[in-house]
A protein has these predicted regions:
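Secretory-pathway/membrane protein signature
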Residues: 1-435
Length: 435
């Protein structure tokens, strides 16, 4: 796991030094501490080393770091036919260009990935150090660590144990990741204007909205999104124009002063791009529980939808069925699955657990989860009651329906409020990009 990632970082640094590569930007090689655990009393207890690095040790990196490249299990082969690159959504266009047209990407070593490296990126998650940098406005990439699902898979049998030893090491995968991400670092370094595509942000905002649940707030949201999309596209065209001009200057063997002037324009635009990216993280990006990265209103939207299904099932008198549409088949999904704890543990245990998840009960101890959560639906009394009635076969669910209905209405109010906040934020971001 982590030892190979550190080895890869050091190998990349050595390769650049030994080759005489002269970067246009500062390139820092970092090994973070506390990647697996670094805090107590919080559900956001991992990647705290990275959080401390970007927030306290070097907060000046935020706003001028064009990319962070991270590694997880970079020498493990799980049988994939095609290698993949994971990144924030706004880097998906750059990834496609890098793979398809940059000319820098080498073929996988010994055809370890017989279908090569995919041009289609995969969105990142919260399970590694990149999430701490992203929260501070630093966009990032990471290799795709293999998992091998199922009880006999590598994750289940070896991950985070002494069985993650030398016989799990693949030199071909390690060298392929070194080649791929080393070339990506050079590609980023050599490109004057950072191709961080905010059209992807617009796509996520569009996909996130359930217009039916949003009701009368849907149209203002969509109108603001249309304006933002136009601004994002204009910004992307400005990025492309600078990079095209730079490439033309290189092809024409322009003098150094000309190249430096184009690069300076690129740096100025990069500052604007990174400001916009950080704004996106602060205003739009939420986290459900500690795992799902979503547009903020989705947490409430999901709750409204799930609770509606629970109420409908109770009105039919169905707690559980083979189709999975009974009230108890659905209720565990409330609050991003946090309700599931009540199926096995006491209310006291669940209260202690949830206190480590929420800002108001655990201030200053959420790290990369700060300002990313939502107000949870207080449906657990009804859920606990249903679990008890499932044992007694009591079929009167009037009181439980009332609890769920009340909390659904409250979640609807939070949903409306968050959609309106996001609408205002889209308008502000449009102005930022147009300035």
């Amino acid at each position: 796991d982590d030892s190979c990632a550190i080895g890869l970082v050091l190998a990349m640094a050595k390769g650049m030094v030994d080759s005489g590569y002269q970067p246009e930007n500062d390139i820092l090689f970092i090994a973070h501490g506390a990647e697996e655990w670094g805090a107590s009393g919080t559900q956001f207890d991992w990647t705290t080393g990275a959080w401390e690095m970007i927030n306290n040790a070097h907060p000046e990196w935020a706003g001028k770091t064009i990319a962070m490249i991270n590694f997880e299990l970079p020498a493990f082969y799980d049988g994939m036919s095609q290698g993949q690159i994971s990144c924030v959504p706004e880097f998906s266009t750059l990834t496609k260009t890098f793979v398809e047209t940059s000319g820098l990407l080498a073929e996988p070593v010994d055809a370890i990935y017989p279908e090569g490296i995919s041009a289609e990126s995969v969105d990142t998650n919260t399970m590694e150090d990149g999430v701490s940098y992203r929260a501070s406005g630093v966009p990032y990439f990471i290799n795709i660590p293999g998992t091998q699902e199922g009880e006999k898979g590598w994750i289940q049998q070896r991950y985070h144990t002494v069985a993650d030893d030398r016989d799990t090491y693949s030199a071909q995968v390690m060298q392929t990741n070194l080649n791929t991400f080393g070339a990506l670092a050079i590609y980023l370094d050599q490109t004057p204007a950072l191709a961080l595509d905010l059209n992807a942000t617009c796509d996520d905002l569009q996909e996130a909205l359930d217009t039916t649940l949003a009701g009368e707030d849907a149209q203002p949201y969509l109108d603001a999104l249309d304006a933002l999309r136009n601004a994002a596209q204009a910004h992307q065209e400005e990025i492309a124009a600078i990079n095209a001009q730079y490439q033309d200057a290189l092809d024409e063997k322009a003098d150094q002063q000309t190249l430096d002037e184009i690069r300076e324009r690129g740096r100025a635009l990069n500052a604007k791009t990174l400001d916009a990216f950080r704004f996106v993280q602060e205003q739009f990006i939420g986290i459900i529980s500690t795992s799902d990265i979503v547009i903020k209103h989705v947490a409430y939207q999901n709750n409204v939808d799930v609770i509606e299904g629970v109420i409908a099932a109770l009105e039919e008198g169905v707690l559980s069925n083979e189709e999975g549409s009974g009230a108890l088949d659905l209720a565990w999904m409330i609050n991003g699955g946090a309700e599931y704890g009540y199926y096995s543990f006491s209310t006291e245990t669940n209260a202690a657990s949830l206190a480590t998840l929420q800002e108001e009960s655990n201030p200053g101890n959420l790290f990369w989860g700060t300002d990313k959560g939502s107000v949870l639906a207080q449906t657990y009394p009804a859920t606990v009651s249903l679990l008890e009635k499932a044992e007694s076969e009591d079929g009167d669910f009037t009181e439980e329906i009332a609890v769920y209905a009340k909390e659904q209405a409250q979640q609807e109010r939070y949903l409306q409020e968050m959609i309106r906040q996001e609408t205002d934020a889209m308008q502000e971001l449009t102005q930022m990009l147009g300035a």
